[in-house]
């Protein structure tokens, strides 16, 4: 019997850790992928390694990219400040084409592995408004994946799985806890220090803290 494989986009944050746990629960042999893309919050890479070990990923791969060479985001350009108060519209923490690039590389690895499912922790409820987290984007990428790959055109189609798409942050946290996620291992902060301590002020920190509060669960986040 062939092993059921999946590629998991694992940033080291709360959402992607939850997705990895859900995929494991579904019986997948999970291969996780993270990206060192020039992000200011590089502590998330160490968090991803911790989560991959805790959840038993078959292999954890870190791909180097220079999205800082493109710029245009507070996460890759130190000259652009990370906002510490809510703002209207798409915030400057949006990284141009990030999820498109990440999914494309995950797709390539999935095809090599013979995996048909790619899991991503995007969410369109408690989120920052990024266009590449929306259901329409995920659906469009899946269509493209099955037109652009050898496996896809030969009838062995890919699925882009986004199980958190319509969940609130509190629902995500409760689901992760049911499936064994240790959120103390994760880093969500956009400007976490080298030790992974959070600022408590950026949009990602606010969403995370509100999620734990609404879920009625102790928040294990370490603050600087």
Curated annotation (Swiss-Prot):
UniProt keyword terms in alphabetical order: ATP-binding, Ligase, Metal-binding, Nucleotide-binding, Queuosine biosynthesis, Zinc
Stretch forming the signal peptide: none
Positions bound to ATP: 10-20
Gene Ontology BP term (one): queuosine biosynthetic process
Similarity field: Belongs to the QueC family.
Chain's role: Catalyzes the ATP-dependent conversion of 7-carboxy-7-deazaguanine (CDG) to 7-cyano-7-deazaguanine (preQ(0)).
Stated name of the protein: 7-cyano-7-deazaguanine synthase
Organism of provenance: Azotobacter vinelandii (strain DJ / ATCC BAA-1303)
Gene from which the chain derives: queC
């Amino acid at each position: 019997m062939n092993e059921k494989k999946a590629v998991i986009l694992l940033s080291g944050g709360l959402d992607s850790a939850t997705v990895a746990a859900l995929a494991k629960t579904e019986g997948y042999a999970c291969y996780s992928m993270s990206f060192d893309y020039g992000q200011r919050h590089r502590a998330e890479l160490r968090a991803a390694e911790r989560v991959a070990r805790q959840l038993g990923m078959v292999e954890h791969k870190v791909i180097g990219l220079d999205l800082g060479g493109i710029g245009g985001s507070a996460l890759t350009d130190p000259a652009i400040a990370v906002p510490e108060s809510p703002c209207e519209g798409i915030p400057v923490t949006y990284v141009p084409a990030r999820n498109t690039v990440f999914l494309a590389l995950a797709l390539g690895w999935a095809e090599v592995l013979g995996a048909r499912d790619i899991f991503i922790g995007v969410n369109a409820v408690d989120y920052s408004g990024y266009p590449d987290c929306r259901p329409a984007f995920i659906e469009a990428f899946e269509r493209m994946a099955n037109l652009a790959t050898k496996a896809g055109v030969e009838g062995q189609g890919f699925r882009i799985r986004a199980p958190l798409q319509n969940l609130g942050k509190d629902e995500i946290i409760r689901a992760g806890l049911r499936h064994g996620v240790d959120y103390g291992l994760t880093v969500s902060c956009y400007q976490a220090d080298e030790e992974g301590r959070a600022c408590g002020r950026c949009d990602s920190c606010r969403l995370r803290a509100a999620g734990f509060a609404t879920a009625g669960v102790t928040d294990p986040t370490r603050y600087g």
